[in-house]
Amino acid sequence: MSYDRAITVFSPDGHLFQVEYAQEAVKKGSTAVGVRGKDIVVLGVEKKSVAKLQDERTVRKICALDDNVCMAFAGLTADARIVINRARVECQSHRLTVEDPVTVEYITRYIASLKQRYTQSKRRRPFGISALIVGFDFDGTPRLYQTDPSGTYHAWKANAIGRGAKSVRVEFEKNYTDEAIETDDLTIKLVIKALLEVVQSGGKNIELAVMRRDQPLKILTSPEEIEKYVAEIEKEKEENEKKKQKKTS
């Protein structure tokens, strides 16, 4: 039997190959990173260069699900569009029914459940996306979750998905500390530093989404805004290098 063609059949060694292939599609996608700060959550994505005549506003890897929740994804954009639309409808339905916005975990669990159903149904295939979902609960607590094509989800302090995820996670493990997220600017810099590990051409290929407590989502697409942070990061690197040289001399 061809186990890699059947969506709902396990191989003898316990694999669901279609789910694993969906995870491979995620690994080929643009890098996306997320960091949970003290009073801020930040998403950053690697921007791919667009065709000369293409409107780059139509190429977005970050989107709002509700006033208090935002999502970035890696993988197949068409699949992401279905998940995003379903999640937005669920957010609206929750507001109408409960008269409160969704919690970040609630909508993450909804998205994860949707993905999981597509791993157990005939005539469907798994969604080829992973998502980073950030936001604030109504008590002001910042949240960051990650979901994958199998339907699992976990809470994180900082994480990455997409083709550069492994390198970025190593960077986060080295640099993520309470001091590194002490202020909003430091949290934003941490995201940009991590993306610079895998993104060429500096700030012009980076897009950021910033959400602060009790403030609306702000998406930074202007290269000038991001280059300002990149210049500060480069300056800090140079100063650290000079300090190291003084110590060794």
From Swiss-Prot:
One of its GO terms (biological process) is proteasome-mediated ubiquitin-dependent protein catabolic process. It comes from the Eukaryota. The keyword Transmembrane helix does not apply. The keyword Ribonucleoprotein does not apply. Signal peptide: none annotated. GO terms for cellular component: cytoplasm; nucleus; proteasome core complex; proteasome core complex, alpha-subunit complex. Its main location: cytoplasm. It is found in: Cytoplasm; Nucleus. Gene3D superfamilies: Glutamine Phosphoribosylpyrophosphate, subunit 1, domain 1 (3.60.20.10). InterPro entries: Ntn_hydrolases_N, Proteasome_alpha, Proteasome_alpha-type, Proteasome_asu_N, Proteasome_sua/b. Pfam families: Proteasome (PF00227), Proteasome_A_N (PF10584). Keywords: Cytoplasm, Nucleus, Proteasome. Component of the 20S core proteasome complex involved in the proteolytic degradation of most intracellular proteins. This complex plays numerous essential roles within the cell by associating with different regulatory particles. Associated with two 19S regulatory particles, forms the 26S proteasome and thus participates in the ATP-dependent degradation of ubiquitinated proteins. Belongs to the peptidase T1A family. The 26S proteasome consists of a 20S proteasome core and two 19S regulatory subunits. The 20S proteasome core is a barrel-shaped complex made of 28 subunits that are arranged in four stacked rings. The two outer rings are each formed by seven alpha subunits, and the two inner rings are formed by seven beta subunits. The proteolytic activity is exerted by three beta-subunits PSMB5, PSMB6 and PSMB7. PSMA7 interacts directly with the PSMG1-PSMG2 heterodimer which promotes 20S proteasome assembly. Interacts with HIF1A. Interacts with RAB7A. Interacts with PRKN. Interacts with ABL1 and ABL2. This is Proteasome subunit alpha type-7. It comes from Gallus gallus (Chicken). The lineage of its organism: Eukaryota, Metazoa, Chordata, Craniata, Vertebrata.
